[in-house]
Amino acid sequence: VKASRKEATAWHLSGTPEPDGYVNLVTMMLRVPEVKACAKEHGVTVTELLCAAMMQAIDHLQAEKVPARSRRKPVKVTVPVNLRGLFPSHTLRNFASYVNTEIDPRLGSYTFDEICQLVHHTMGLGNDAKTMRAKIATNVASEKSPVLRVMPLFVKNIAMKAAFNAVGECKACLCLSNLGVVQVPEVMRPYIERFDFVIGPQANAPHNCGVATWGDTVYVSCVRNIKEPELELRFYRVLHSLGLHVTVESNAR
Protein backbone atom coordinates (compact mmCIF):
# COMPACT_ATOMS: atom_id res chain seq x y z
CA VAL A 1 0.00 0.00 0.00
CA LYS A 2 1.32 3.42 -0.95
CA ALA A 3 1.13 6.43 1.35
CA SER A 4 -0.29 9.71 0.09
CA ARG A 5 2.09 12.66 -0.17
CA LYS A 6 -0.72 15.19 0.21
CA GLU A 7 -0.16 17.53 3.14
CA ALA A 8 -1.09 21.07 4.03
CA THR A 9 1.62 23.67 3.43
CA ALA A 10 3.16 24.95 6.65
CA TRP A 11 3.71 28.56 7.70
CA HIS A 12 7.11 29.95 6.71
CA LEU A 13 8.86 32.81 8.39
CA SER A 14 10.32 35.39 6.05
CA GLY A 15 12.98 38.01 6.58
CA THR A 16 15.80 40.00 5.05
CA PRO A 17 18.07 37.65 3.07
CA GLU A 18 21.79 37.80 3.75
CA PRO A 19 23.23 39.52 0.64
CA ASP A 20 26.27 37.28 0.18
CA GLY A 21 24.89 33.87 1.10
CA TYR A 22 26.12 34.18 4.68
CA VAL A 23 24.58 31.62 7.07
CA ASN A 24 23.95 32.70 10.64
CA LEU A 25 24.55 30.07 13.32
CA VAL A 26 23.20 30.28 16.86
CA THR A 27 24.19 27.42 19.17
CA MET A 28 22.28 26.86 22.39
CA MET A 29 23.98 24.65 24.97
CA LEU A 30 21.82 22.79 27.50
CA ARG A 31 22.73 20.61 30.47
CA VAL A 32 21.95 16.94 29.82
CA PRO A 33 20.57 16.14 33.32
CA GLU A 34 18.19 19.11 33.15
CA VAL A 35 16.97 18.25 29.66
CA LYS A 36 16.37 14.60 30.59
CA ALA A 37 14.50 15.58 33.75
CA CYS A 38 12.35 18.05 31.83
CA ALA A 39 11.55 15.48 29.13
CA LYS A 40 10.61 12.91 31.78
CA GLU A 41 8.39 15.46 33.53
CA HIS A 42 6.43 15.99 30.31
CA GLY A 43 6.37 12.30 29.36
CA VAL A 44 8.35 12.65 26.14
CA THR A 45 11.80 11.94 24.73
CA VAL A 46 14.51 14.60 24.45
CA THR A 47 13.88 14.90 20.70
CA GLU A 48 10.15 15.31 21.27
CA LEU A 49 10.77 17.92 23.99
CA LEU A 50 12.97 20.05 21.73
CA CYS A 51 10.55 19.61 18.83
CA ALA A 52 7.64 20.77 21.01
CA ALA A 53 9.66 23.77 22.21
CA MET A 54 10.48 24.74 18.63
CA MET A 55 6.84 24.36 17.58
CA GLN A 56 5.67 26.58 20.43
CA ALA A 57 8.27 29.19 19.45
CA ILE A 58 7.03 29.13 15.84
CA ASP A 59 3.41 29.25 17.02
CA HIS A 60 4.09 32.34 19.15
CA LEU A 61 5.94 34.02 16.30
CA GLN A 62 3.17 33.36 13.79
CA ALA A 63 0.61 34.73 16.27
CA GLU A 64 2.57 38.00 16.35
CA LYS A 65 2.95 38.15 12.57
CA VAL A 66 -0.59 37.01 11.71
CA PRO A 67 -3.07 38.38 14.29
CA ALA A 68 -6.13 36.90 12.54
CA ARG A 69 -6.31 33.28 13.74
CA SER A 70 -8.35 32.17 10.71
CA ARG A 71 -5.49 33.18 8.39
CA ARG A 72 -2.77 31.25 10.19
CA LYS A 73 -1.18 28.14 8.69
CA PRO A 74 -0.15 24.85 10.30
CA VAL A 75 3.01 24.77 12.38
CA LYS A 76 4.97 21.71 11.30
CA VAL A 77 8.44 20.46 12.17
CA THR A 78 10.07 17.60 10.26
CA VAL A 79 11.84 15.03 12.44
CA PRO A 80 14.15 12.57 10.61
CA VAL A 81 13.83 8.91 11.61
CA ASN A 82 16.64 6.34 11.42
CA LEU A 83 15.17 3.37 9.55
CA ARG A 84 17.86 0.98 10.75
CA GLY A 85 15.82 0.44 13.89
CA LEU A 86 12.83 -0.70 11.81
CA PHE A 87 14.37 -2.56 8.88
CA PRO A 88 17.54 -4.69 8.71
CA SER A 89 20.19 -2.90 6.69
CA HIS A 90 23.98 -2.84 6.52
CA THR A 91 24.26 0.08 4.12
CA LEU A 92 26.64 2.91 4.98
CA ARG A 93 24.46 5.33 3.04
CA ASN A 94 21.84 7.55 4.64
CA PHE A 95 18.92 5.24 5.49
CA ALA A 96 16.28 7.52 6.96
CA SER A 97 12.77 8.82 6.52
CA TYR A 98 10.84 11.49 8.39
CA VAL A 99 7.79 12.29 10.48
CA ASN A 100 6.03 15.66 10.20
CA THR A 101 4.76 16.79 13.60
CA GLU A 102 1.96 19.35 13.41
CA ILE A 103 -0.35 21.70 15.27
CA ASP A 104 -3.07 23.82 13.64
CA PRO A 105 -3.26 27.29 15.27
CA ARG A 106 -6.65 27.90 13.66
CA LEU A 107 -8.16 25.43 16.13
CA GLY A 108 -7.13 27.49 19.16
CA SER A 109 -4.22 28.06 21.53
CA TYR A 110 -2.00 25.17 22.60
CA THR A 111 -0.31 24.74 25.97
CA PHE A 112 3.18 23.28 26.00
CA ASP A 113 1.89 20.01 27.45
CA GLU A 114 -0.67 19.75 24.65
CA ILE A 115 2.04 20.23 22.04
CA CYS A 116 4.21 17.62 23.78
CA GLN A 117 1.41 15.07 23.67
CA LEU A 118 0.64 15.76 20.01
CA VAL A 119 4.32 15.41 19.10
CA HIS A 120 4.68 12.25 21.19
CA HIS A 121 1.70 10.48 19.64
CA THR A 122 2.53 11.67 16.11
CA MET A 123 6.04 10.26 16.46
CA GLY A 124 4.62 7.01 17.82
CA LEU A 125 2.24 6.62 14.89
CA GLY A 126 4.71 7.76 12.24
CA ASN A 127 7.77 5.87 13.48
CA ASP A 128 6.24 2.50 12.70
CA ALA A 129 7.39 -0.18 10.26
CA LYS A 130 4.04 -0.38 8.45
CA THR A 131 3.77 3.40 8.04
CA MET A 132 7.36 3.70 6.84
CA ARG A 133 6.89 0.77 4.47
CA ALA A 134 3.98 2.62 2.84
CA LYS A 135 6.16 5.73 2.37
CA ILE A 136 8.92 3.63 0.83
CA ALA A 137 6.38 1.96 -1.49
CA THR A 138 5.33 5.40 -2.76
CA ASN A 139 8.93 6.30 -3.63
CA VAL A 140 9.60 2.92 -5.27
CA ALA A 141 6.43 3.24 -7.38
CA SER A 142 7.71 6.55 -8.75
CA GLU A 143 11.03 4.95 -9.66
CA LYS A 144 9.23 2.25 -11.65
CA SER A 145 7.38 4.75 -13.83
CA PRO A 146 8.10 3.92 -17.53
CA VAL A 147 8.47 7.61 -18.33
CA LEU A 148 11.01 8.19 -15.57
CA ARG A 149 12.99 5.07 -16.45
CA VAL A 150 13.78 6.35 -19.96
CA MET A 151 14.31 9.96 -18.93
CA PRO A 152 17.97 11.17 -19.05
CA LEU A 153 19.60 11.46 -15.62
CA PHE A 154 20.33 15.19 -15.89
CA VAL A 155 16.64 15.85 -16.57
CA LYS A 156 15.67 13.68 -13.59
CA ASN A 157 18.04 15.59 -11.33
CA ILE A 158 16.59 18.95 -12.37
CA ALA A 159 12.99 17.72 -12.07
CA MET A 160 13.55 16.05 -8.69
CA LYS A 161 15.21 19.12 -7.21
CA ALA A 162 12.41 21.37 -8.47
CA ALA A 163 9.74 19.00 -7.13
CA PHE A 164 11.46 18.70 -3.75
CA ASN A 165 11.77 22.47 -3.40
CA ALA A 166 8.15 22.99 -4.48
CA VAL A 167 6.29 20.26 -2.59
CA GLY A 168 8.83 18.75 -0.19
CA GLU A 169 10.38 21.29 2.13
CA CYS A 170 7.40 23.65 1.90
CA LYS A 171 5.33 21.15 3.88
CA ALA A 172 7.19 21.98 7.11
CA CYS A 173 8.49 25.12 8.81
CA LEU A 174 11.90 23.55 9.35
CA CYS A 175 13.69 20.29 10.10
CA LEU A 176 14.87 19.38 13.60
CA SER A 177 17.38 16.54 13.37
CA ASN A 178 18.80 14.99 16.54
CA LEU A 179 22.01 13.06 16.03
CA GLY A 180 21.76 11.79 19.61
CA VAL A 181 24.66 10.98 21.91
CA VAL A 182 27.88 10.95 19.90
CA GLN A 183 29.94 7.80 20.51
CA VAL A 184 33.67 7.61 19.79
CA PRO A 185 36.47 5.22 20.80
CA GLU A 186 37.76 5.98 24.30
CA VAL A 187 41.24 6.78 22.98
CA MET A 188 39.78 9.72 21.03
CA ARG A 189 37.89 11.33 23.91
CA PRO A 190 40.79 13.33 25.42
CA TYR A 191 41.28 15.12 22.09
CA ILE A 192 37.65 16.12 21.52
CA GLU A 193 36.20 19.27 23.03
CA ARG A 194 32.67 19.12 21.56
CA PHE A 195 30.52 18.04 18.65
CA ASP A 196 28.21 20.32 16.68
CA PHE A 197 25.65 19.03 14.20
CA VAL A 198 24.99 21.83 11.69
CA ILE A 199 22.62 21.39 8.75
CA GLY A 200 22.12 24.02 6.05
CA PRO A 201 19.00 26.16 5.66
CA GLN A 202 16.21 24.95 3.41
CA ALA A 203 15.62 26.20 -0.12
CA ASN A 204 12.17 27.62 0.62
CA ALA A 205 12.49 28.28 4.36
CA PRO A 206 15.23 30.24 6.10
CA HIS A 207 15.76 28.01 9.15
CA ASN A 208 16.95 24.55 10.14
CA CYS A 209 18.07 22.94 13.38
CA GLY A 210 20.57 20.20 14.26
CA VAL A 211 21.09 18.64 17.71
CA ALA A 212 23.97 16.60 19.09
CA THR A 213 24.95 15.51 22.60
CA TRP A 214 28.53 15.24 23.79
CA GLY A 215 29.41 14.64 27.42
CA ASP A 216 27.04 16.52 29.70
CA THR A 217 25.97 19.06 27.07
CA VAL A 218 23.25 19.12 24.42
CA TYR A 219 24.28 21.36 21.51
CA VAL A 220 21.32 22.80 19.58
CA SER A 221 22.56 24.46 16.37
CA CYS A 222 20.04 26.81 14.73
CA VAL A 223 20.93 28.11 11.27
CA ARG A 224 19.24 30.79 9.18
CA ASN A 225 20.00 32.67 5.95
CA ILE A 226 18.10 35.81 6.95
CA LYS A 227 19.26 38.62 9.21
CA GLU A 228 16.49 38.62 11.83
CA PRO A 229 17.04 36.20 14.77
CA GLU A 230 13.34 36.23 15.72
CA LEU A 231 12.81 32.47 15.87
CA GLU A 232 15.97 31.80 17.87
CA LEU A 233 14.93 34.43 20.43
CA ARG A 234 11.51 32.85 20.94
CA PHE A 235 12.98 29.34 21.04
CA TYR A 236 15.36 30.52 23.77
CA ARG A 237 12.43 31.99 25.71
CA VAL A 238 10.52 28.71 25.56
CA LEU A 239 13.53 26.74 26.80
CA HIS A 240 14.11 29.26 29.59
CA SER A 241 10.44 29.08 30.60
CA LEU A 242 10.89 25.32 31.08
CA GLY A 243 13.53 25.99 33.72
CA LEU A 244 16.46 25.01 31.51
CA HIS A 245 19.77 26.84 31.79
CA VAL A 246 20.75 27.91 28.28
CA THR A 247 24.16 29.16 27.15
CA VAL A 248 24.11 30.87 23.76
CA GLU A 249 26.86 31.58 21.25
CA SER A 250 26.65 32.97 17.75
CA ASN A 251 28.73 33.69 14.66
CA ALA A 252 26.92 37.02 14.20
CA ARG A 253 29.02 39.58 12.38
What are the functions of these language-model segments?
Residues 1-44:
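Flexible, P/S/T/G-rich "lid" or insertion loops adjacent to the active sites of thioester-utilizing
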Residues 25-30, 36, 60-253:
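Acyl-thioester-dependent acyl-group transfer interface
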Residues 46-55:
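Short amphipathic alpha-helical segments
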